Amino acid sequence: MTIALSFSDTIALLHLGDDENRFSPEFLDQFEAHLDDAISLGAHALVTVATGKFYSNGLDLDWLAAHGDQTGWYVGRVQALLARMLTLPMPTAAAIGGHSFGAAAMLALAHDFRVMRIDRGYFCFPEVDIRIPFTPGMAALIQAKLTPQAAVSAMTTGRRFGGAEAEAIGIVDATAKEDAVIGTALNMLAPLGLKDPGTIGAIKNTMFGQAVAALKAVS
């Protein structure tokens, strides 16, 4: 599994992969390292994207099954990444070209904007059906980004939202055909590229302070 960083002009493109792109410890390490690179290289904005059937399928359940004694550490690691994305000091957009489930859907919500493929892929929180309650931090993140109506619909039903449904309820900001998802995300961010990073970071930390505190408060 290799995550790659490229640029479109001054906008960083973080490529998550072409498989299920689950959140293994290696995946999380690479993601964080590339965020560091994007910042150090002077990116004005960032888009995350994946190739194939999945944007990401979320938590690495196989790794968790084999390392049950490290569950607390792992959840803390995932939530630290969500908190960082939520407050990244640049405009961000998730280009969702495939399925986005569970923690991956939370990662998408941690971006400032979301563009979803119109004709394929589902956005879903399956936790209610797989009997895994949301942590306080994860619930706080979702509720910070969605209206109460959308949060209840997404969190308590296990509903799989297609692109049009996700846009209608406010989960994503736009939809596009397969070959236009990335371009739409880039166009969304391009006018925002000259915003001051320190100011953006400060605003996000204030806006999402409660969610960030809950994400970082892992026992």
Task: Annotate the PLM regions.
Residues 1-49:
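Conserved CoA-thioester-binding segment of acyl-CoA-metabolizing enzymes
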Residues 138-149:
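Hydrophobic, secondary-structure "cap" segments at the distal end of domains
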Residues 82-130:
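Glycine-rich beta-to-alpha active-site loop
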Residues 53-57, 101-102, 210:
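Short, active-site-adjacent cap segments at secondary-structure transitions
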Residues 1-17, 153-194, 202-219:
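Amphipathic alpha-helical segments at domain termini/boundaries
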Residues 34-37, 77-89:
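Catalytic-core regions built around general acid/base machinery
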Residues 48, 107-108, 166, 185:
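Hydrophobic/aromatic residues within transmembrane alpha-helices
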Residues 49-81:
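Glycine- (often His-adjacent) and acidic-residue-rich active-site loop
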